[in-house]
Regions:
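Active-site-proximal helix-loop-helix substrate-binding element of RNase H-like nuclease domains
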Residues: 32, 37, 41-183
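Entry/capping segment at the start of metal-dependent catalytic domains
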Residues: 1-31
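Acidic catalytic cores of enzymes that act on phosphate-bearing nucleotides/polynucleotides
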Residues: 185-188
Length: 188
């Protein structure tokens, strides 16, 4: 059995906190910006869809391969968003590390779970995420200064974009490391 840990970064004009993940991903302007993954114990790989990269065909095949378990922190979000974007994947093949953690009495939240089980600093979630999500994944107000644009794209701040890519990859590493700690305690 293969294992594929996944994290995506997305954007949509729909406020996910107010409307929920389904409405967010159903928006006409919904987009997956990047897709990071770790196959088994191989290094994390990043696919920057926003810059024209494509998910490797082998990985696309694994998304609906019953012999590959997909893992994510809040797996329902990744599953639904990937399906909305045309990558068909069966929910029964997914395992939610957040659910697994809370089932065991650990706190929810990738960072809090990692801290609670004491994972090494180089495996933890990066703290830069919220401001990067606000910059790239939430519409910006059009102003004279920003040329009237409603979205920030990678070329608007390459340094921030690079950090956002690192953040996405590190989320996969954090989820994978947490799962390695939790897998001895099966969820029925």
């Amino acid at each position: 059995m293969q294992h594929l840990s996944i994290d995506i970064e997305t954007r949509s004009s729909v406020n996910i906190a107010k409307s929920g993940a389904y409405k967010y991903a159903q928006s006409e302007d919904f987009e997956i910006l990047m897709f990071s993954y770790k196959l088994n114990d191989l290094p994390v790989q990043l696919v920057v869809l926003k810059q024209g990269e494509k998910i490797p065909p082998y990985i696309v095949g694994l998304l609906n391969d019953e012999n590959c378990i997909k893992h994510a922190y809040n797996a329902a979000f990744e599953w639904y968003c990937l399906n909305q974007a045309g990558y068909k994947t069966n929910i029964s093949q997914w395992r939610c590390t957040m659910f697994h953690a809370t089932y065991l009495g650990l706190p929810a939240g990738l960072s809090m779970t990692g801290n609670a089980i004491g994972i090494a600093d180089d495996k933890k979630k990066l703290t830069t995420g919220n401001r990067l999500i606000q910059f790239f994944s939430v519409p910006c107000k059009p102003t004279k200064t920003n040329g009237g644009r409603t979205w920030n794209d990678p070329y608007h701040d390459l340094d921030k974009w690079k950090l956002y890519c690192e953040y996405n990859m590190q989320d996969v590493e954090a989820e994978y490391t947490i799962y390695q700690h939790l897998k001895a305690f099966e969820v029925p």
